[in-house]
Amino acid sequence: MDTKNATACMAALTCALLSAGTALGSTEAQKDAAISSGLAWLAGTQAANGSWCGSGYCAADTAAALLAFTEQRYKPGGWGAADYSANVTNALNFILRDASTIAIPNNRGDGNNPNISGSGIGYIWGGGEATYVTGLVLPALARVTAGVNGLSPTTVISGTGNASVDGRTYGQVIQDTVATFANGQTRADNAAWPGARGGWRYYPGDGQSDGSTAQWPAIGMLFAQAVPGVTVPAFVKNELRSWMDYIQNPNGGVGYDSPTSLVNESKTGGLLVQTAFTGYAGSVSGPGDDSDRAGAIAFLNARWTNAANSTWDGNFGHPYAMWSIYKGLESTIGLSGAEISNFLYAPAARIKDDPADVWNWWEDYSQYLVETQNADGSWDGYSYWTGAMAASWNINILNATEIPDGSDVPEPGTLALLAAGLAGLGSLRRRPA
């Protein structure tokens, strides 16, 4: 990257933002208070070993919390008067201690080489639910290297007690975690059924795919490819297109292991994450077929006000679905995308800093999360997704966590310069897109 030009661009952006006085919607003070309260609750419930473990998959809960602390640290105003540096360090050390390795070949069976670094290993977390858990860990690892606690991709890991990571850099661990997903992607030659090609299921390499699980490698690699020096092989994205075309129902929604099974909101949000990751919007076969990105968004808009139900279904009050949908919409239409218009809150009920602010789907989500937060800073969650998992995802929605688009990113030093220039803009989160 041309650092001089990048710095100049960042300075220009800073000036432009400083001259724009309009807040992005409903009460920013309420959002900030909810985030602060949520982070304080998380800090108070962290175990002595650095983990959170409410779901039974400790690395997953811990990674979700780590991402919440990390993303807020990068926002204007950061952690405020609190200092969560020790919480971040302890969570990160737990995750690194918990890492396991698998062998990565130079040919995964279809002529493609997933062994990008040449190390011959891949990192993995979560046992039988490894795709989910590793997909939660990878974004957290990627984001801490942008400067939290002085970490960068070239920082050498030490003192974890895990010989597989100690002595390696964060960038190397991130790259070899990408290799786990690249190697474990379902191939044409090992697919349990033809439509499974290109996706993932619970454990990488099991020859199966499902519409819920497949979003997690995609979101993990979206974050990973934004880390300087980390590469995601093009063949992974190309193969994923096959799965995307197969699993989407003609009504725009997404099924579980077939396009007609268990179609719901959360899996549809996951498909949008995959469109952002691959750059592929899907294709329609003719009139009445909404099997593409626009169809998925229309499916979500029509069901936007649905409450959590039947374990996996619904939107509002369902942490898994809301985080899935948030990731999908933020990465495709941005926070202010007008494609979602079937709002939960009627105009008279909308809380705004400025009556002239235009309502959007993110404000709809944010007001709901502010209103449903418990006095202690937690949220009730739903079904499997309670405690730290629910709180962490809700915090990341409220602070408008930006899903990387995979383009070249500034070095941490340039990002720090931008953050300094925006230090007074506590109410500003992300430009409309």
Question: What residues fall within each predicted segment?
Answer:
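Bacterial N-terminal signal peptides
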Residues: 10-19
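Sec/Tat signal peptide C-region and signal peptidase I cleavage site
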Residues: 21-25
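A short, hydrophobic C-terminal helix/tail in secreted or cell-surface proteins
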Residues: 410-428
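Short, charged juxtamembrane terminal tails flanking transmembrane helices
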Residues: 430-433
